[in-house]
A protein has these predicted regions:
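Hydrophobic alpha-helical transmembrane segments
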Residues: 75-95, 214-226, 417-425, 546-569
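Transmembrane helix-loop-helix hairpins at membrane boundaries of multipass inner-membrane proteins
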Residues: 1-4, 22-121, 193-212, 237, ...
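Hydrophobic alpha-helical membrane-insertion segments
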Residues: 37-54, 180-189, 380-388, 508-528, ...
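Membrane-interfacial helical/loop segments at transmembrane boundaries in membrane proteins
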Residues: 59-77, 199-207, 398-405, 409, ...
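Alpha-helical transmembrane segments and their helix-start/interface "positive-inside/aromatic belt" motifs
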Residues: 28-42, 171-181, 371-380, 499-514, ...
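Aromatic-capped, Gly/Pro-kinked transmembrane alpha-helices
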Residues: 74-83, 503, 514, 525-561, ...
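Hydrophobic transmembrane alpha-helices and their helix-loop junctions in integral membrane proteins
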Residues: 100-145, 151-494
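Hard-cation-handling environments
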Residues: 446, 455-467, 471-568
Length: 673
């Protein structure tokens, strides 16, 4: 059963190739159905391999399949192969499962788009690349998938490239990720220099024999790659702008799969982190918890329905980094899976709202949609309760695990990490409740040309909102382009009554809602008081997993405190945006994301540009000048010598004569003295 692991990435690759060369001929909706079936087949193959692993003993849950030798260069021997172990197959299951639902949703969402087949070409290629990333048996194959998802992200974010904002957002995502990719590449060079291999099995066995400072440097470089891909401080600025792509792209790439690649990488290389100094895990924890808090504060003041979810994603990824930093690797994977369920649900739900409102994304022009889109509203609220950490939804169990490990990690800063995580949980309950109340409750603000500046500003009118002004780089920006799905849905701000989405869009919402409710069971104890997911991942993560000693009473107390924090956030949002008893406070500094993006842009356009110009001048005049100078000298000397080779016998005879005279003169002079 394990031998079919190659089929998991092969099916999306086959779908990509078929659609690349025959997508136009297949047309709509056949191209979408083919892409969806390829993902579904990949999910089925993942289930088969998963069942095969369950049938093995814990020691036997490790299978490497080599397809061919890729790089046979001296000591560097790299194969294209797949590693089927509990971690990789867990990732493959939720990547292919969620991807299948998003592909199904996209068939209806992208209906009428002039580039319908091309969209699914990119989507299948992305799924293939993501599976290469998680299944690769060595760092180089993982890096191949790593770069593949980055390229697909660029193509999909800027899919509606007729809008300059979309094209710019795609470039921003691509360039920002290059910084992290630089760290990943340096890590591969260092790993080969220190251990002599890039294969995971040999690398993890050999890392115990290298100096701690080398292991620390290796972990720090890999962390740089993870920070870029998973949108952590300071490289998070690309993710909110990436909402410019079609909403299914936001759900697939920027919520459920690609952005979790950094967390997966840090979890995969846990032996390297364990072999180095403790300051690298500490740094991971602090990067995560600060990112979680900062992104949550930004989310409370956003009005674009997708921007709220974007900053929420950055915040939840911060929780996962916190888990990795305190050694709670299972909790990180658990929250990654739960987050994939409820965040994909929330993004697809927002897409359903945007579709039903004819491409409107500004929450100030929504309201009362639960009466017109009941199924979307109910499923969206399931995702809301899950991310807010309300039991028994999936987010409660996974977030509680992370906060528990932060509390019991034993470090001097353990309680501080826990406290910041708790405040973030409160803010999460607040901003997600704000979104739900603004979109689905209150007065219908979509029917007029003016709306309250926020749903809870005491009902005071605000400046008129231009139809379609919702997303500064979203679907509304291209609604007028006849070649886009936005045009098929209708122009933003159109005063038609909102409508529920078709069944191809609502069916994935229902299935993801069920997973968001029941997803927590995957890490509940079933036998011998051992959590299922923890037991399954034991062969990969057990050796370096943190073990904490927290009394049962303390665990219950911490869980109750976390739930109460989320409920306080919900209650405050209710008072402000639902019952309107309190005037909303949305500082401009938060609406502008602490002006961090502006400062980065100003630096890149000012001092940064001058620095880069200086580097370019140094490269052109000093580095290239030295190389070109040597060539110029050699060329000049050669030109002078070339004149000696005249081709005339008399010239050669003269040269010989002069040479003989010089030699004789030299010896005569020596003999005279």
């Amino acid at each position: 059963m394990l031998d079919v692991v190659w089929l998991i990435p092969a099916l999306p690759l086959a779908g990509f190739l078929i659609l690349l060369f025959g997508g136009r001929r297949l047309g709509e909706p056949a191209a979408g159905w083919l892409a969806t079936l390829c993902c579904a087949g990949s999910f089925a193959a993942s289930v088969v391999v998963y069942a095969g692993l369950l049938g093995e003993s814990e020691e036997g849950r490790h299978f490497t399949q080599t397809l061919f030798e890729w790089v046979p260069v001296g000591a560097l021997q790299v194969d294209v192969g797949f590693l089927a172990d509990p971690l990789s197959i867990t990732m493959a299951l939720f990547v292919t499962g969620v991807s299948t639902l998003i592909h199904l949703y996209s068939i209806a969402y992208m209906h009428g788009d002039g580039d319908f087949p091309k969209f699914f070409v990119y989507m299948n290629l992305f799924v293939f690349s993501m599976l290469m990333l998680v299944l690769g048996s060595n760092l180089l194959v993982t890096f191949l998938g790593w770069e593949g998802v980055g390229a697909c992200s660029y193509w999909l974010v800027s899919f509606w490239f007729s809008s300059e904002a979309n094209a710019t957002a795609g470039k921003k995502a691509f360039v920002t990720n290059r910084i992290g990719d630089w760290g990943f590449m340096l890590a591969m060079f260092l790993a080969f220099a220190a251990v002599g291999t890039l294969n995971y099995d040999e690398l993890f066995a050999g890392v115990e024999n290298i100096a701690p400072v080398t292991a620390t440097a290796l972990g720090a470089l890999l962390l740089l790659g993870a920070v870029g891909k998973s949108a952590q401080i300071p490289l998070y600025i690309w993710l909110p702008d990436a909402m410019a792509g079609p909403t299914p792209v936001s759900a697939l790439i920027h919520a459920a799969t690609m952005v979790t690649a950094g967390v997966f990488l840090m979890t995969r290389v846990n032996p390297i982190l364990a072999a180095g100094y403790e300051w690298v895990p500490d740094m991971i924890a602090w990067i995560g918890v600060i990112t979680a808090l900062v992104a949550a504060t930004i989310a409370v003041a956003q009005n674009d329905i997708k921007k709220v979810l974007a900053y929420s994603t950055v915040s939840q990824l911060g929780y996962m980094f916190l888990a990795v930093g305190v050694g709670a690797y299972v909790a990180a994977i658990f929250h990654m899976i739960a987050h994939a369920f409820f965040k994909a649900l929330l993004f697809l739900g927002s897409g359903s709202v945007i579709h039903g409102l004819h491409e409107e994304q500004d929450m100030r022009r929504m309201g009362a949609l639960r009466r017109f889109m009941p199924l979307t509203a109910v499923t969206f609220m399931v995702g809301w309760l899950a991310i807010a950490g309300v039991p028994p939804f999936a987010g409660f169990w996974s977030k509680d695990d992370i906060l528990l490990f932060a509390w019991g990690s034993g470090g001097a800063d353990a309680k501080v990490l826990w406290a910041i995580g708790l405040v973030t949980a409160l803010l999460t309950g607040y901003y997600m409740s704000r979104q739900v109340f603004m979109v689905f409750f209150g007065d219908a603000r979509w029917a007029g040309t003016a709306a309250p500046s926020s749903a809870g500003h005491g009902g005071e009118p605000a400046d008129e909102i231009t139809p379609g002004a919702a997303g500064d780089a979203g679907e509304a920006a291209v609604a007028a382009d006849p070649g886009t799905a936005a045009a098929a849905h209708g122009p933003a701000g159109e005063h038609a009554e909102p409508h529920e989405s078709p069944w191809l869009m609502t069916l994935p919402l229902v299935m993801l809602a069920v997973l968001s409710i029941a997803g927590g069971v995957i890490n509940l104890p079933f036998n011998d008081d051992v959590d299922f997911l923890e037991h399954f991942l034991e062969p990969v993560l057990g050796e370096n997993e943190a073990h904490i000693a927290v009394p049962t009473g303390t665990k219950v107390t911490l869980a109750v405190i976390a739930v109460v924090a989320g409920l306080i956030g919900i209650a405050v949002a209710s008072a402000v945006y639902l019952r309107r008893r309190v005037r909303a406070v949305e500082p401009e500094v938060l609406a502008h994301a602490w002006y961090y993006d502006e400062e980065v842009s100003a630096f890149m356009g000012g001092p940064g540009r001058k620095s880069f110009d200086g580097i370019a001048w140094f490269d052109a005049h000093i580095v290239d000048g030295a190389v070109n100078g040597v060539a110029t000298v050699v060329r000049a000397v050669g030109g002078r010598l070339r004149s000696v080779q005249s081709g005339f016998v008399r010239s050669y005879a003269l040269g010989v004569t002069v040479g003989v005279v010089v030699v004789l003169g030299y010896f005569l002079t020596r003999l005279s003295f």
